[in-house]
Amino acid sequence: MQFNYSKLLGRIREFGLTQKDVAAHIGIRATTLSLKLNGKARFTANEIDAICKLLHIAKEDIGDYFFTT
């Protein structure tokens, strides 16, 4: 199943961050984050949690950002 991360990408831009910034914050390479955002790899629960904290995404909204097809 392929997920659509356009809402997550928009949120990253809203915060004035780059994919490189987010990747550094969660401890992965920017290329790895790109793979995840393009559906070539999956996010771990820890990565999702860290991104939600960084971008102030409420737990009840996680599905809207990470599990939309």
Q: Which residues are covered by each model-predicted region?
A:
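DNA major-groove recognition helix of helix-turn-helix/homeodomain DNA-binding modules
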Residues: N46-D61
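Short alpha-helical DNA-recognition segment
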Residues: L17-L35
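Residue-level signal for the short linker/turn that defines the boundary of a DNA-recognition helix
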Residues: L17, F43-N46
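The alpha-helix within a helix-turn-helix
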Residues: I12, A23, C52
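Residues within the helices of the helix-turn-helix
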Residues: L9, K20, D49
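A short, Lys/Arg-rich alpha-helix, primarily the initiator
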Residues: M1-L17
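DNA major-groove recognition helix of helix-turn-helix
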Residues: L37, E47, F66
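Short amphipathic recognition helices of helix-turn-helix/homeodomain-type DNA-binding modules
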Residues: I62-T69
